[in-house]
Amino acid sequence: MNDARKKLYISDVTLRDGSHAIRHQYSIANVKAIAAALDRAGVDSIEVAHGDGIEGSSFNYGFGAHSDVEWIEAAAASVKHAKIATLLIPGIGTIHDLRNAYDAGARVVRVATHCTEADVSRQHLEYAREIGMDPVGFLMMSHMTTPQKLAEQAKLMESYGATCVYVVDSGGALGMNDIRDRFRAFKEALKPETQTGMHAHHNLSLGVANSLVAVEEGCDRIDASLAGMGAGAGNAPLEVFIAAAERQGWHHGCDLYGLMDAADDIVRPLQDRPVRVDRETLALGYAGVYSSFLRHAERAADKYGLKTVDILVELGRRKMVGGQEDMIVDVALDLLKSAEHERTHAEPTMSEAGR
């Protein structure tokens, strides 16, 4: 259970996960303003990168307005207290890219893998520790395996040097009891000194609730973003989580009103698509789909005259995971072909029409 005297580690992800919400188009001025506001408000770390992690800028994931190094340097120059964090997905970013991020000012790295593939994080976690970074394990799509198997993967990351391992609800598909079960499994499997973290998405409107439950189960680090800025329906809104934590009497060290101002005055105006629970983002949580698929699926739906929800539900049925963004167009074409087949067979033949 949570010790109310314990200082929660507040990890902001507006400048990384939030990048998905605007197709990775943060300007340097945006980064500086957001990082400075977060630093003044007292968060512990500020994650900065392309939405898909360092070196994610590509045809497959979407090109960023700037390089990760440029974003990280801008954020690092704008803070006095908060640590700059970044995210690396093995296979997208390399240890050489991680070194570049470190030289630019990043001091925390979250090495992200699919929830059953922790073994691919070893090289990156060990290297991060070697160069003096805080190495964190990040188990994405945590709803796609059992609590016990997830804990086994967390144990692997711990053995590679991770100081903290996250339950990552990439699809926003986990319920509150699912969160309890996973953190209890972590507690049984991990060493007492290894911290745990929660990264929620708000697709079922449970981002804040799940984060609160995680803390009740002893979670040390909470991810959240200003105005919920993130993939899909967004992450747990930082200002909302802090307000709820304050009402619980928990020690978070943040300026609530400063966060509220930053969310409404700086971040929300940047959204070209509202970050909210709606028909499409709800489908992500319902079908258990990777939240960053949203904008890609919307683009495919618009191009081929389909419903975004139909594409997302089919992606969920096929159990597509992060890194398979290129398959979204294939799924759209399959749905289009199926619809044309049904339409052709539904039309009466000439002989039937003449009866």
UniProtKB/Swiss-Prot annotation:
| Keywords in alphabetical order | Aromatic hydrocarbons catabolism, Lyase, Manganese, Metal-binding
MF GO annotations: 2-isopropylmalate synthase activity; 4-hydroxy-2-oxovalerate aldolase activity; manganese ion binding
Binding residues for substrate: R16, D17, S170, H199, Y290
Residue ranges of domain Pyruvate carboxyltransferase in the record: 8-260
Keyword Mitochondrion, does the record have it?
A: no
| A Pfam family hit | DmpG_comm
Give the Enzyme Commission number. 4.1.3.39
Give me the reactions it catalyses: (S)-4-hydroxy-2-oxopentanoate = acetaldehyde + pyruvate
| Top-rank taxon, per record | Bacteria
The record's active-site residues are: H20
List the residue(s) that the UniProt entry marks as the site Transition state stabilizer. Answer: R16
Q: Name one GO biological process term.
A: L-leucine biosynthetic process
Locate the residues binding Mn(2+).
Answer: D17, H199, H201
- Is-annotated flag, keyword DNA repair? no
Q: PANTHER family, per this entry?
A: 2-ISOPROPYLMALATE SYNTHASE 1, CHLOROPLASTIC-RELATED, HOMOCITRATE SYNTHASE-RELATED
Task: Report the family membership.
Answer: Belongs to the 4-hydroxy-2-oxovalerate aldolase family.
Matching entries from NCBIfam families are given as: 4OH_2_O_val_ald, PRK08195.1
Q: What is this protein called?
A: 4-hydroxy-2-oxovalerate aldolase 1
Species name for this entry? Burkholderia lata (strain ATCC 17760 / DSM 23089 / LMG 22485 / NCIMB 9086 / R18194 / 383)
